[in-house]
C-alpha cells in the first residue's frame, strides 16, 4: 500500500515538473515572424485540428467503453455474437475519408502557393544573398553590396530576401525557423528560397541536416533591421573589415573544417565567387566522366549548371 501511494505521488510530481519545464520551451515554428512562416503555421494548425476530429472521439470511446463494460457493471449489455453495424461502418469510414480528401486538397494548394523558389509578391526589391554551407559554418555573399559574412546576415524587415543556396561540402539544410521554409544545400547545385520578415528582430538560423561532428555548432543569426537605413549601416560596418575574399585561395582557406566559428565580415568579395563554388564541382564531375561511355558522358554533361529550384523543402 505504501509503495502504491509512493508511486502515485511520484507520478504527480513528475507530471508537475514536466509541465513546469515545458512551459519554458519556445516553439519557433508556432511563433513565426515572417509571412511564409505564418502561412505554414496556419497549415500545421489546420491539419492538427482536423486530425483531432478522429483522435479525440477515439480516445473518449476507448475510455468510455472500458468504463461501461467493466467487470463490476452488471447493467452492461452482453453481446458476444455482435460483429457488424452499418451505422458504425459508415461513421468510421466516411469521416476519415472526408478528412483525408480535405487535407489532400489543402496540402496540394498550399504546397504550390508556398513553393520556395516562387518569388514573393511585394513592392520592395528583394535583397539577394548567396549562401554556401561549409564544414561547419555558413558563408554568405551579398553580390549587390560586394561584401560577405560568416554566420550572420542582415536585411530590412518587410523586404523580400532571395537566397541562392549551395554547398561546399556534404549536403546540408538552410533553415531560419521563425521565417519559414528550409531548403537543401547541395554541392554543384543551386537551390532557391524566398523569405520575408514581418517585423524587426534577430532570428536564429540553423543547419537542419546532420553534416558531421561540427553540426551542432553550425548556427547563424539573421538580423531583420527596422528599415533600409539600418541595413545600410550594417553593410557599412562590414565594408570596414580588413578581411577580404579576393580569390578562391582565400575561400578554400576559410572553407577548411572548423567548429563553433565566430562572426566574420569581408569588405570585398571576388566577383562571381558563388558561381565558381558551384562550377568547381561540375568541373570535377566532367573530369570523372572522361572514363565513362559517350552516352553517359552526355547525360552527366547535361546536368551542368543545374538549378534545383524544386528540391525537397519543408513547407
From Swiss-Prot:
Molecular functions (GO terms): copper ion binding; cytochrome bo3 ubiquinol oxidase activity; cytochrome-c oxidase activity; electron transfer activity; oxidoreductase activity, acting on diphenols and related substances as donors, oxygen as acceptor; oxidoreduction-driven active transmembrane transporter activity; proton transmembrane transporter activity
Residues with a covalently attached lipid (S-diacylglycerol cysteine): 25
Compositional bias segments (type: Basic and acidic residues): 294-315
Covalent lipidation (N-palmitoyl cysteine), chain numbering: 25
Subcellular location: Cell inner membrane
Record-linked SUPFAM superfamilies: Cupredoxins, Cytochrome c oxidase subunit II-like, transmembrane region
Disrupted-gene phenotype: Increased reduction of the ubiquinone pool (in aerobically grown minimal medium with glucose).
Region ranges (Disordered): 288-315
PROSITE patterns per the UniProt record, alphabetical: COX2_CUA, COX2_TM, PROKAR_LIPOPROTEIN
GO cellular component: cytochrome o ubiquinol oxidase complex; plasma membrane
One Pfam family from the record: COX_ARM
UniProt topological domain (Periplasmic) ranges: 25-50, 112-315
Signal peptide: 1-24
Biological-process GO terms, alphabetical: aerobic electron transport chain; aerobic respiration; ATP synthesis coupled electron transport; electron transport coupled proton transport
Topology relative to the membrane: Multi-pass membrane protein
Regulation of protein activity: Competitively inhibited by piericidin A, non-competitively inhibited by 2-n-heptyl-4-hydroxyquinoline N-oxide, NaN(3) and KCN; 50% inhibition occurs at 2 uM, 2 uM, 15 mM and 10 uM, respectively. Inhibited by Zn(2+) and Cd(2+).
Subunit structure: Heterooctamer of two A chains, two B chains, two C chains and two D chains.
Family statement: Belongs to the cytochrome c oxidase subunit 2 family.
Protein name: Cytochrome bo(3) ubiquinol oxidase subunit 2
